[in-house]
Amino acid sequence: MIKYNKVVLAYSGGLDTSIIIPWLKENYGCEVIAVCGNVGQKDELDGLEEKAIKTGASKLYIEDLTQEFVDDYIFPTIQAGAIYEGKYLLGTSFARPIIGKRLVEIAKAEGADAICHGCTGKGNDQVRFEMAVKAFAPEMPIIAPWRIWDIKSREDEIDYAEAKNVPLKINRETNYSKDKNIWHLSHEGLDLEFPENEPQYDKILELCKTLEAAPNEATYITLSFENGIAIALNGKKMNSVELLDELNKIGGENAIGITDMVENRLVGMKSRGVYETPGGTILYKAHKDLEELCLDKETAHYKEQIALKFADLVYNGQWFTPLREALTEFVNKTQETVTGEIKLKLYKGNIVNAGMTSPYSLYSEEYATFGEDGVYDQKDSAGFINLYGLPTVVKAKMQEKIKKEEM
Protein backbone atom coordinates (compact mmCIF):
# COMPACT_ATOMS: atom_id res chain seq x y z
CA MET A 1 0.00 0.00 0.00
CA ILE A 2 1.27 3.47 -0.93
CA LYS A 3 2.43 5.56 2.03
CA TYR A 4 1.27 9.12 2.58
CA ASN A 5 2.53 11.59 5.15
CA LYS A 6 -0.50 13.85 5.34
CA VAL A 7 -4.06 13.22 4.17
CA VAL A 8 -6.96 15.69 4.09
CA LEU A 9 -10.27 13.98 4.87
CA ALA A 10 -13.74 15.23 3.96
CA TYR A 11 -15.24 14.89 7.43
CA SER A 12 -18.85 15.08 8.59
CA GLY A 13 -18.66 13.31 11.93
CA GLY A 14 -21.00 10.62 10.67
CA LEU A 15 -20.35 6.91 10.79
CA ASP A 16 -18.35 6.64 7.56
CA THR A 17 -15.89 9.47 8.11
CA SER A 18 -15.56 8.81 11.85
CA ILE A 19 -14.10 5.35 11.33
CA ILE A 20 -11.97 6.47 8.39
CA ILE A 21 -9.69 8.52 10.67
CA PRO A 22 -8.35 5.51 12.64
CA TRP A 23 -8.40 3.42 9.46
CA LEU A 24 -6.16 5.91 7.63
CA LYS A 25 -3.71 6.07 10.52
CA GLU A 26 -3.68 2.29 10.83
CA ASN A 27 -3.14 1.61 7.12
CA TYR A 28 -1.06 4.58 5.97
CA GLY A 29 0.60 5.78 9.16
CA CYS A 30 -0.28 9.30 8.10
CA GLU A 31 -1.36 12.52 9.75
CA VAL A 32 -5.08 13.07 9.17
CA ILE A 33 -6.43 16.59 8.77
CA ALA A 34 -10.22 16.61 8.89
CA VAL A 35 -12.20 19.20 6.93
CA CYS A 36 -15.88 19.81 7.49
CA GLY A 37 -17.70 22.02 5.01
CA ASN A 38 -20.44 23.87 6.86
CA VAL A 39 -23.24 24.11 4.32
CA GLY A 40 -25.91 24.82 6.90
CA GLN A 41 -26.16 21.54 8.82
CA LYS A 42 -26.13 23.56 12.09
CA ASP A 43 -26.56 21.32 15.15
CA GLU A 44 -24.61 18.51 13.47
CA LEU A 45 -21.47 20.61 14.01
CA ASP A 46 -21.81 20.58 17.80
CA GLY A 47 -18.89 18.76 19.42
CA LEU A 48 -17.39 17.94 16.04
CA GLU A 49 -13.88 19.20 16.75
CA GLU A 50 -13.63 17.28 20.01
CA LYS A 51 -14.83 14.12 18.28
CA ALA A 52 -12.41 14.47 15.35
CA ILE A 53 -9.40 15.00 17.62
CA LYS A 54 -10.44 12.20 19.96
CA THR A 55 -10.78 9.87 16.99
CA GLY A 56 -7.22 10.64 15.84
CA ALA A 57 -7.24 13.72 13.58
CA SER A 58 -4.44 16.23 14.14
CA LYS A 59 -6.80 19.13 13.51
CA LEU A 60 -10.25 19.96 12.18
CA TYR A 61 -11.18 22.74 9.81
CA ILE A 62 -14.82 23.81 9.97
CA GLU A 63 -15.29 25.97 6.90
CA ASP A 64 -18.40 28.14 6.77
CA LEU A 65 -19.50 27.78 3.16
CA THR A 66 -23.20 28.44 3.71
CA GLN A 67 -23.48 31.88 2.10
CA GLU A 68 -21.45 30.85 -0.93
CA PHE A 69 -23.42 27.62 -1.17
CA VAL A 70 -26.76 29.43 -1.32
CA ASP A 71 -25.67 32.29 -3.57
CA ASP A 72 -23.44 30.46 -6.06
CA TYR A 73 -24.91 26.96 -6.17
CA ILE A 74 -28.49 26.83 -4.89
CA PHE A 75 -29.93 30.01 -6.36
CA PRO A 76 -28.46 29.49 -9.87
CA THR A 77 -30.00 26.01 -9.87
CA ILE A 78 -33.40 27.43 -8.91
CA GLN A 79 -33.08 30.00 -11.70
CA ALA A 80 -32.38 27.15 -14.11
CA GLY A 81 -35.47 25.30 -12.89
CA ALA A 82 -33.36 22.15 -12.61
CA ILE A 83 -35.13 19.18 -11.01
CA TYR A 84 -33.74 15.67 -11.39
CA GLU A 85 -36.26 13.15 -12.73
CA GLY A 86 -39.13 15.49 -11.97
CA LYS A 87 -38.81 15.19 -8.19
CA TYR A 88 -35.34 15.57 -6.71
CA LEU A 89 -34.30 19.14 -5.88
CA LEU A 90 -30.60 18.18 -5.90
CA GLY A 91 -29.91 18.84 -2.22
CA THR A 92 -26.90 16.56 -1.90
CA SER A 93 -25.79 16.94 -5.50
CA PHE A 94 -24.85 20.62 -5.50
CA ALA A 95 -23.40 20.53 -1.98
CA ARG A 96 -20.53 18.25 -3.03
CA PRO A 97 -18.78 20.51 -5.57
CA ILE A 98 -18.32 23.41 -3.15
CA ILE A 99 -16.98 21.08 -0.44
CA GLY A 100 -14.66 19.36 -2.91
CA LYS A 101 -13.30 22.70 -4.07
CA ARG A 102 -12.53 23.74 -0.49
CA LEU A 103 -10.88 20.37 0.22
CA VAL A 104 -8.41 21.04 -2.58
CA GLU A 105 -7.65 24.55 -1.31
CA ILE A 106 -6.89 23.26 2.19
CA ALA A 107 -4.93 20.26 0.90
CA LYS A 108 -2.69 22.58 -1.10
CA ALA A 109 -2.25 24.97 1.83
CA GLU A 110 -1.37 22.08 4.16
CA GLY A 111 0.95 20.38 1.69
CA ALA A 112 -1.10 17.19 1.84
CA ASP A 113 -0.17 14.10 -0.18
CA ALA A 114 -3.75 12.97 -0.80
CA ILE A 115 -7.44 13.70 -0.31
CA CYS A 116 -9.80 11.14 1.19
CA HIS A 117 -13.60 10.85 1.19
CA GLY A 118 -16.01 8.41 2.80
CA CYS A 119 -18.39 7.89 -0.11
CA THR A 120 -19.58 4.40 -0.86
CA GLY A 121 -18.55 2.76 -4.11
CA LYS A 122 -22.23 2.29 -4.93
CA GLY A 123 -23.19 5.95 -4.72
CA ASN A 124 -23.14 9.21 -6.64
CA ASP A 125 -21.13 11.25 -4.15
CA GLN A 126 -17.84 9.52 -4.94
CA VAL A 127 -18.16 10.89 -8.47
CA ARG A 128 -19.18 14.38 -7.36
CA PHE A 129 -16.31 14.77 -4.89
CA GLU A 130 -13.70 13.36 -7.22
CA MET A 131 -14.87 15.44 -10.19
CA ALA A 132 -14.40 18.55 -8.04
CA VAL A 133 -10.92 17.45 -6.98
CA LYS A 134 -9.94 16.70 -10.57
CA ALA A 135 -11.15 20.13 -11.65
CA PHE A 136 -8.78 21.94 -9.28
CA ALA A 137 -6.00 19.44 -8.55
CA PRO A 138 -5.90 16.83 -11.31
CA GLU A 139 -2.63 15.42 -9.97
CA MET A 140 -3.90 14.90 -6.40
CA PRO A 141 -4.22 11.22 -5.31
CA ILE A 142 -7.65 10.32 -3.95
CA ILE A 143 -8.24 7.67 -1.28
CA ALA A 144 -11.69 6.07 -1.28
CA PRO A 145 -11.74 3.51 1.57
CA TRP A 146 -15.07 1.97 0.56
CA ARG A 147 -13.45 0.76 -2.64
CA ILE A 148 -10.50 -0.92 -0.94
CA TRP A 149 -11.19 -1.88 2.68
CA ASP A 150 -12.70 -5.10 4.08
CA ILE A 151 -15.73 -3.36 5.57
CA LYS A 152 -18.80 -4.33 3.52
CA SER A 153 -21.81 -2.94 5.39
CA ARG A 154 -22.91 -0.37 7.94
CA GLU A 155 -23.09 -3.16 10.49
CA ASP A 156 -19.40 -3.83 9.82
CA GLU A 157 -18.73 -0.12 10.28
CA ILE A 158 -20.40 -0.10 13.67
CA ASP A 159 -18.35 -3.14 14.69
CA TYR A 160 -15.15 -1.36 13.63
CA ALA A 161 -16.18 1.83 15.43
CA GLU A 162 -16.84 -0.05 18.64
CA ALA A 163 -13.49 -1.84 18.35
CA LYS A 164 -11.68 1.50 17.90
CA ASN A 165 -13.73 3.30 20.59
CA VAL A 166 -15.15 5.76 18.08
CA PRO A 167 -18.10 7.59 19.69
CA LEU A 168 -21.37 7.19 17.77
CA LYS A 169 -24.74 8.92 18.02
CA ILE A 170 -26.54 6.14 16.16
CA ASN A 171 -27.46 2.55 16.92
CA ARG A 172 -28.15 -0.46 14.76
CA GLU A 173 -31.93 0.00 14.83
CA THR A 174 -32.08 3.70 13.85
CA ASN A 175 -29.20 3.76 11.44
CA TYR A 176 -30.74 5.68 8.52
CA SER A 177 -28.17 7.16 6.19
CA LYS A 178 -28.73 10.93 6.29
CA ASP A 179 -27.38 14.02 4.59
CA LYS A 180 -28.28 17.47 5.89
CA ASN A 181 -27.60 21.02 4.78
CA ILE A 182 -29.47 24.33 4.67
CA TRP A 183 -31.39 23.11 1.62
CA HIS A 184 -32.58 19.65 2.60
CA LEU A 185 -32.38 16.52 4.71
CA SER A 186 -32.26 13.10 3.06
CA HIS A 187 -33.04 9.68 4.54
CA GLU A 188 -31.98 6.34 3.05
CA GLY A 189 -31.61 2.75 4.18
CA LEU A 190 -33.35 0.38 6.61
CA ASP A 191 -37.05 -0.08 5.76
CA LEU A 192 -36.80 2.50 2.95
CA GLU A 193 -34.74 0.04 0.92
CA PHE A 194 -37.97 -1.87 0.25
CA PRO A 195 -40.27 0.07 -2.14
CA GLU A 196 -43.36 -1.74 -0.82
CA ASN A 197 -42.92 -0.08 2.59
CA GLU A 198 -44.67 3.17 3.38
CA PRO A 199 -42.21 5.58 5.04
CA GLN A 200 -42.78 5.99 8.76
CA TYR A 201 -42.99 9.75 8.47
CA ASP A 202 -43.79 10.27 12.13
CA LYS A 203 -40.42 8.69 12.96
CA ILE A 204 -38.37 9.90 9.99
CA LEU A 205 -39.20 13.57 9.53
CA GLU A 206 -37.08 16.20 11.26
CA LEU A 207 -37.54 19.41 9.26
CA CYS A 208 -41.20 18.91 8.32
CA LYS A 209 -44.37 18.07 10.17
CA THR A 210 -46.45 15.21 8.85
CA LEU A 211 -49.52 16.10 6.79
CA GLU A 212 -51.71 15.07 9.71
CA ALA A 213 -49.82 17.26 12.20
CA ALA A 214 -49.70 20.36 9.98
CA PRO A 215 -52.01 23.28 10.89
CA ASN A 216 -55.66 23.14 9.85
CA GLU A 217 -55.48 26.77 8.76
CA ALA A 218 -53.61 27.94 5.65
CA THR A 219 -50.51 30.13 5.89
CA TYR A 220 -50.05 32.96 3.37
CA ILE A 221 -46.66 34.36 2.40
CA THR A 222 -45.43 36.84 -0.20
CA LEU A 223 -42.07 36.44 -1.95
CA SER A 224 -40.33 39.20 -3.90
CA PHE A 225 -37.97 38.31 -6.75
CA GLU A 226 -35.39 40.32 -8.64
CA ASN A 227 -33.82 38.81 -11.76
CA GLY A 228 -34.99 35.37 -10.69
CA ILE A 229 -33.57 35.64 -7.16
CA ALA A 230 -35.76 35.79 -4.05
CA ILE A 231 -34.84 38.95 -2.13
CA ALA A 232 -37.69 39.52 0.34
CA LEU A 233 -40.26 37.61 2.38
CA ASN A 234 -43.51 39.31 3.35
CA GLY A 235 -42.06 42.65 2.34
CA LYS A 236 -38.93 42.28 4.47
CA LYS A 237 -35.62 42.19 2.60
CA MET A 238 -33.28 39.44 3.76
CA ASN A 239 -29.99 37.97 2.68
CA SER A 240 -30.26 34.61 0.97
CA VAL A 241 -29.35 32.49 4.00
CA GLU A 242 -31.82 34.26 6.30
CA LEU A 243 -34.58 33.96 3.71
CA LEU A 244 -34.01 30.25 3.15
CA ASP A 245 -33.86 29.58 6.90
CA GLU A 246 -37.18 31.35 7.40
CA LEU A 247 -38.82 29.51 4.50
CA ASN A 248 -37.59 26.21 5.94
CA LYS A 249 -39.38 26.99 9.20
CA ILE A 250 -42.60 28.10 7.52
CA GLY A 251 -42.57 25.28 4.98
CA GLY A 252 -41.70 22.63 7.54
CA GLU A 253 -44.55 23.75 9.78
CA ASN A 254 -46.96 23.25 6.86
CA ALA A 255 -45.56 19.87 5.74
CA ILE A 256 -44.19 21.34 2.52
CA GLY A 257 -41.47 19.57 0.53
CA ILE A 258 -41.69 15.92 1.59
CA THR A 259 -40.63 13.68 -1.30
CA ASP A 260 -40.44 9.89 -1.45
CA MET A 261 -38.79 8.79 -4.68
CA VAL A 262 -36.95 6.01 -6.47
CA GLU A 263 -34.20 7.60 -8.53
CA ASN A 264 -31.73 6.39 -11.13
CA ARG A 265 -28.23 6.77 -9.74
CA LEU A 266 -25.32 7.79 -11.92
CA VAL A 267 -23.63 4.44 -11.22
CA GLY A 268 -26.50 2.51 -12.78
CA MET A 269 -28.73 1.26 -9.98
CA LYS A 270 -31.98 2.58 -8.59
CA SER A 271 -32.17 3.85 -5.02
CA ARG A 272 -34.96 5.08 -2.80
CA GLY A 273 -34.87 8.08 -0.52
CA VAL A 274 -37.11 10.37 1.47
CA TYR A 275 -36.20 14.03 1.10
CA GLU A 276 -37.28 17.01 3.18
CA THR A 277 -36.88 20.28 1.26
CA PRO A 278 -39.41 22.72 2.73
CA GLY A 279 -37.95 26.11 1.83
CA GLY A 280 -36.57 24.91 -1.47
CA THR A 281 -39.90 23.55 -2.63
CA ILE A 282 -41.53 26.92 -1.94
CA LEU A 283 -38.82 28.76 -3.88
CA TYR A 284 -39.09 26.46 -6.90
CA LYS A 285 -42.87 26.86 -7.04
CA ALA A 286 -42.73 30.65 -6.65
CA HIS A 287 -39.98 31.06 -9.23
CA LYS A 288 -41.66 28.78 -11.78
CA ASP A 289 -45.00 30.56 -11.49
CA LEU A 290 -43.38 33.99 -11.84
CA GLU A 291 -41.58 32.80 -14.98
CA GLU A 292 -44.96 31.86 -16.46
CA LEU A 293 -45.87 35.53 -16.19
CA CYS A 294 -42.58 37.01 -17.39
CA LEU A 295 -41.05 34.74 -20.05
CA ASP A 296 -42.15 34.62 -23.67
CA LYS A 297 -43.32 31.29 -25.05
CA GLU A 298 -40.22 30.31 -27.05
CA THR A 299 -37.82 31.16 -24.21
CA ALA A 300 -39.95 29.36 -21.63
CA HIS A 301 -40.23 26.21 -23.75
CA TYR A 302 -36.55 26.10 -24.65
CA LYS A 303 -35.58 26.76 -21.04
CA GLU A 304 -37.45 23.61 -20.02
CA GLN A 305 -34.99 21.61 -22.14
CA ILE A 306 -32.08 23.45 -20.55
CA ALA A 307 -33.47 22.66 -17.09
CA LEU A 308 -33.38 18.92 -17.80
CA LYS A 309 -29.75 19.01 -18.93
CA PHE A 310 -28.76 21.33 -16.09
CA ALA A 311 -30.26 18.89 -13.58
CA ASP A 312 -28.35 15.98 -15.12
CA LEU A 313 -25.08 17.90 -14.97
CA VAL A 314 -25.56 18.80 -11.31
CA TYR A 315 -26.68 15.30 -10.34
CA ASN A 316 -23.78 13.71 -12.21
CA GLY A 317 -21.09 15.81 -10.56
CA GLN A 318 -20.38 18.02 -13.57
CA TRP A 319 -20.72 21.40 -11.89
CA PHE A 320 -17.22 22.54 -12.82
CA THR A 321 -17.61 21.99 -16.55
CA PRO A 322 -17.77 24.37 -19.53
CA LEU A 323 -21.27 23.19 -20.41
CA ARG A 324 -22.74 23.89 -16.97
CA GLU A 325 -21.11 27.33 -16.99
CA ALA A 326 -22.45 28.04 -20.48
CA LEU A 327 -25.96 26.97 -19.51
CA THR A 328 -25.80 29.27 -16.49
CA GLU A 329 -24.98 32.18 -18.80
CA PHE A 330 -28.04 31.36 -20.88
CA VAL A 331 -30.20 31.11 -17.77
CA ASN A 332 -28.90 34.46 -16.48
CA LYS A 333 -30.09 36.12 -19.68
CA THR A 334 -33.57 34.65 -19.29
CA GLN A 335 -33.81 35.92 -15.73
CA GLU A 336 -33.41 39.61 -16.56
CA THR A 337 -37.18 40.08 -16.51
CA VAL A 338 -38.12 37.56 -13.80
CA THR A 339 -38.88 40.27 -11.27
CA GLY A 340 -42.02 40.70 -9.22
CA GLU A 341 -44.06 39.52 -6.25
CA ILE A 342 -46.01 36.34 -5.72
CA LYS A 343 -48.40 35.41 -2.93
CA LEU A 344 -48.58 31.76 -1.94
CA LYS A 345 -51.04 29.76 0.13
CA LEU A 346 -49.46 26.92 2.11
CA TYR A 347 -51.70 24.17 3.43
CA LYS A 348 -50.88 20.60 4.48
CA GLY A 349 -48.17 19.92 1.92
CA ASN A 350 -49.73 22.02 -0.83
CA ILE A 351 -48.53 25.30 -2.34
CA VAL A 352 -51.14 27.33 -4.19
CA ASN A 353 -50.51 30.48 -6.21
CA ALA A 354 -52.62 33.22 -4.60
CA GLY A 355 -51.75 36.01 -7.03
CA MET A 356 -48.67 37.62 -8.60
CA THR A 357 -47.54 40.85 -10.21
CA SER A 358 -44.54 41.93 -12.26
CA PRO A 359 -43.47 45.11 -14.07
CA TYR A 360 -42.34 42.75 -16.87
CA SER A 361 -45.58 40.78 -17.07
CA LEU A 362 -46.38 39.57 -20.59
CA TYR A 363 -49.94 38.80 -19.62
CA SER A 364 -52.33 41.31 -21.19
CA GLU A 365 -55.91 41.46 -19.96
CA GLU A 366 -56.82 43.28 -23.18
CA TYR A 367 -55.80 40.33 -25.34
CA ALA A 368 -56.69 37.50 -22.97
CA THR A 369 -60.21 38.58 -21.98
CA PHE A 370 -63.18 36.38 -22.87
CA GLY A 371 -65.32 39.49 -22.86
CA GLU A 372 -65.65 42.19 -25.50
CA ASP A 373 -62.35 43.74 -26.55
CA GLY A 374 -61.11 46.20 -29.13
CA VAL A 375 -57.52 45.07 -29.66
CA TYR A 376 -57.92 41.54 -31.05
CA ASP A 377 -59.74 40.99 -34.34
CA GLN A 378 -60.92 37.40 -34.22
CA LYS A 379 -61.35 37.35 -38.00
CA ASP A 380 -57.54 37.32 -38.26
CA SER A 381 -57.55 33.76 -36.90
CA ALA A 382 -58.89 32.32 -40.15
CA GLY A 383 -55.86 33.35 -42.20
CA PHE A 384 -53.50 32.24 -39.44
CA ILE A 385 -55.06 28.78 -39.24
CA ASN A 386 -54.96 28.38 -43.04
CA LEU A 387 -51.21 29.00 -43.07
CA TYR A 388 -50.53 27.08 -39.85
CA GLY A 389 -52.45 24.09 -41.16
CA LEU A 390 -50.97 24.15 -44.66
CA PRO A 391 -48.59 21.17 -44.09
CA THR A 392 -51.50 19.12 -42.76
CA VAL A 393 -53.65 20.02 -45.76
CA VAL A 394 -50.89 19.13 -48.25
CA LYS A 395 -50.27 15.76 -46.57
CA ALA A 396 -53.99 14.95 -46.48
CA LYS A 397 -54.36 15.70 -50.21
CA MET A 398 -51.32 13.55 -51.00
CA GLN A 399 -52.75 10.60 -49.05
CA GLU A 400 -56.12 11.05 -50.76
CA LYS A 401 -54.44 11.03 -54.18
CA ILE A 402 -52.54 7.81 -53.41
CA LYS A 403 -55.71 6.08 -52.27
CA LYS A 404 -57.47 6.99 -55.53
CA GLU A 405 -54.52 5.71 -57.60
CA GLU A 406 -54.56 2.39 -55.72
CA MET A 407 -58.25 1.82 -56.38
UniProtKB/Swiss-Prot annotation:
Transmembrane segments: none annotated. One of its GO terms (molecular function) is ATP binding. L-aspartate binds at residues 120, 124-125. SUPFAM superfamilies: Adenine nucleotide alpha hydrolases-like (SSF52402), Argininosuccinate synthetase, C-terminal domain (SSF69864). CDD domains: ASS (cd01999). It comes from the Bacteria. InterPro entries: Arginosuc_syn_C, Arginosuc_syn_N, Arginosuc_synth, Arginosuc_synth_CS, Arginosuc_synth_type_1_subfam, AS_cat/multimer_dom_body, Rossmann-like_a/b/a_fold. Its main location: cytoplasm. GO terms for biological process: argininosuccinate metabolic process; L-arginine biosynthetic process; urea cycle. ATP binds at residues 10-18, 118. L-citrulline binds at residues 88, 93, 124, 128, 177, 186, 263, 275. Homotetramer. PANTHER family: ARGININOSUCCINATE SYNTHASE. This is Argininosuccinate synthase. It comes from Clostridium beijerinckii (strain ATCC 51743 / NCIMB 8052) (Clostridium acetobutylicum). The gene is argG.
